[in-house]
């Protein structure tokens, strides 16, 4: 059993086990689709956005206990664990971790890097920034982030529409200034990830949402398995179907 030491405001915290895989993402980049495929494979742990509560840092008091809880929840039956982190969560996580004296002052997000120093990384990108920005705007307008194909489909995603309807965003209004701000935020968030990887000498596996959609299958999981050192190969004939469907429709394209 391995252990990650963090210098906190009290005794040294020891995270019982390393999180094996971290998925780096930005909001509405298509990462939930990838998480569903990974969960369906049953070898990549139980990836989820476990750091959402850290947005409200006053709720996170016992760091060691919180981190060990995340490790336990993110672990699959084979002992492999994985989490997803959004770019805008990085500073929230960093603020809750006290800098180690061994970390150079010039390092970018040093405590996050220290926490995941033994983890493998995947960077999920969406090439079309404008479509990603429109997707963010639509989710704000409709309060819907994800949808399933059928009403009786269960899914782990939040803000879920069970049973997709193309009229879900019928009353949504376009706002050029808001979409422009979303575009700017997406660019900045991707810069944050690029800087984090560069400064901390991390070489992630990069996945493009558009490429995966064009591929039309789950063969990309073989890339993830090789990157993460997991014994797995996709068998398309028997691999579970996705319950989640695209929200994008003609209104998004106007």
Where are these regions (language model features)?
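PAPS-dependent sulfotransferase catalytic core
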Residues: 1-87, 243
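C-terminal accessory extensions appended to soluble enzyme cores
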Residues: 1-8, 230-254
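Alpha-helix termini
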Residues: 43-44, 141, 214, 242
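Residue-level "edge-of-site" marker
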Residues: 51-52, 210, 237-240
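Short secondary-structure transition/capping segments
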Residues: 58-59, 217-218, 245-247
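Short low-complexity, flexible loop/linker segments enriched in glycine and/or proline
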Residues: 61-63, 221-223, 249-250
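PAPS-dependent sulfotransferase catalytic domain
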Residues: 86-199, 204, 212-233
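Hydrophobic residues at beta-strand termini and immediately following loops
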Residues: 207
């Amino acid at each position: 059993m391995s252990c990650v030491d963090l210098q906190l405001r009290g005794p040294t915290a020891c995270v019982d086990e390393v999180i094996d895989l971290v998925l780096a993402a930005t909001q509405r980049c298509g990462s939930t689709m990838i998480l569903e495929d990974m969960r369906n494979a049953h070898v990549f742990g139980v990836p989820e956005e476990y750091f959402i509560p850290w947005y409200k840092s006053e709720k996170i008091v016992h760091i060691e206990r919180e981190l060990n809880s995340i490790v336990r929840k993110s672990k699959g039956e084979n002992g492999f664990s994985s989490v997803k982190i959004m770019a805008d969560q990085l500073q929230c996580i960093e603020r809750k971790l006290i800098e180690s004296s061994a970390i150079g002052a010039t390092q970018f997000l040093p405590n996050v890097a220290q926490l995941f120093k033994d983890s493998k990384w995947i960077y999920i990108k969406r090439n079309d920034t404008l479509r990603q920005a429109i997707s963010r705007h639509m989710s704000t307008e409709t309060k819907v982030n994800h949808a399933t194909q059928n009403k009786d489909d269960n899914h782990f995603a939040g803000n879920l529409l069970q049973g997709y309807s193309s009229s879900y965003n019928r009353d949504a209004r376009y706002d050029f200034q808001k979409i422009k701000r979303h575009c700017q935020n997406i660019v900045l968030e991707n810069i944050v990830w690029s800087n984090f990887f560069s400064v901390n000498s991390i070489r992630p596996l990069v996945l493009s949402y558009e490429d995966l959609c064009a591929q039309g299958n789950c063969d990309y999981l073989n890339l993830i398995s090789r990157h993460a050192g997991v014994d797995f190969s996709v068998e398309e004939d028997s691999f579970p179907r996705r319950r989640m469907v695209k929200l994008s429709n003609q209104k998004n394209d106007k």
